[in-house]
Amino acid sequence: MMSKSMSISVNGQSQVPPGFRFHPTEEELLQYYLRKKVNSIEIDLDVIRDVDLNKLEPWDIQEMCKIGTTPQNDWYFFSHKDKKYPTGTRTNRATAAGFWKATGRDKIIYSNGRRIGMRKTLVFYKGRAPHGQKSDWIMHEYRLDDNIISPEDVTVHEVVSIIGEASQDEGWVVCRIFKKKNLHKTLNSPVGGASLSGGGDTPKTTSSQIFNEDTLDQFLELMGRSCKEELNLDPFMKLPNLESPNSQAINNCHVSSPDTNHNIHVSNVVDTSFVTSWAALDRLVASQLNGPTSYSITAVNESHVGHDHLALPSVRSPYPSLNRSASYHAGLTQEYTPEMELWNTTTSSLSSSPGPFCHVSNGSG
């Protein structure tokens, strides 16, 4: 009794419990609803109405096939295919305002590996063929496909009987209509008028611009931090390795600090990350700005402008143990540049001094 009362339609709408939503699968539409319709078997909850597709427009079907009061995105109905010509096989899908046009190939629907039906996709065009205006209304038309029978399963008599019954009711189909989402609403977005593809590319461009701005901020912050490190470590600044034919590799370098007036032994103590960080910084600038590649020695030389006491020749210390010259072993791994040539020329001109660049004292000597 419950099922009979729930199948009653009032004001063109099926009476269902509140919150009821109808979302059957393709297999359920074919195996349960359409098969029962074809075989005239009562459906437990009759929420799919019979519709004459040639007399109703899509928006009329939308109003007629509502199920309850819950908002819907698709609508279902049964329809009996009307032949366009009495002796032909073409289906008449014209309405008063337009026509339904098939598109693409029919899709085979399977259940447990067995073919049970077909799905045809149609688009509604306003006007008359062949100059109709395409709309956003789409229809999926499902039909049963029971004629594929294995010869080993049934006899010839049974095959003829089944084919006869199928041809008698083959006109019934179950349909689902819905409106295609209009993605062209992006034309009204603040980013400006653009096509659908252009609207998809706009966020990428914006993200790229934001990424470049963030990278530039990181670059400036890194430059400021590196310069601050150099200012704090000026008394212990270690110049990059220079290539000189008169230099020999030594491991230790002694520097006198004017604040403590004591010998400070510097041997792999000063962290050289701030020196090598210039090379990473240069590579970052080159990759972001696509400019010519800079080298760490150029950046170091420019950062030392105004600090002449770091480039003075060795000064005699009042302590005899410190009166030793030091030099750096060739260790540059960058490519040869004109700046290096200028630096090497300066180094060669100072080769007659007791020691180049390493032994530094801020004492009055």
Swiss-Prot record:
Keywords: DNA-binding, Nucleus, Transcription, Transcription regulation. GO terms for biological process: fruit dehiscence; plant-type secondary cell wall biogenesis; positive regulation of DNA-templated transcription. Residues 116-186 bind DNA. The keyword Membrane does not apply. One of its GO terms (molecular function) is DNA-binding transcription factor activity. GO terms for cellular component: nucleus. It is found in: Nucleus. Gene3D superfamilies: NAC domain (2.170.150.80). Residues 16-180 form the NAC domain. The keyword DNA-binding applies. Expressed in various aboveground tissues undergoing thickening of the lignified secondary wall such as anthers, filaments of stamens, the base of carpels, styles, the boundaries between siliques and pedicels, the midrib of leaf veins, and inflorescence stems, specifically in interfascicular fibers (sclerenchyma), cells differentiating into vascular vessels, and xylary fibers (secondary xylem). Transcription activator of genes involved in biosynthesis of secondary walls. Together with NST2 and NST3, required for the secondary cell wall thickening of sclerenchymatous fibers, secondary xylem (tracheary elements), and of the anther endocethium, which is necessary for anther dehiscence. May also regulate the secondary cell wall lignification of other tissues. The NAC domain includes a DNA-binding domain and a dimerization domain. PANTHER family: NAC DOMAIN-CONTAINING PROTEIN 43-LIKE (PTHR31744:SF221), PROTEIN CUP-SHAPED COTYLEDON 2-RELATED (PTHR31744). This is NAC domain-containing protein 43. The lineage of its organism: Eukaryota, Viridiplantae, Streptophyta, Embryophyta, Tracheophyta. The gene is NAC043.
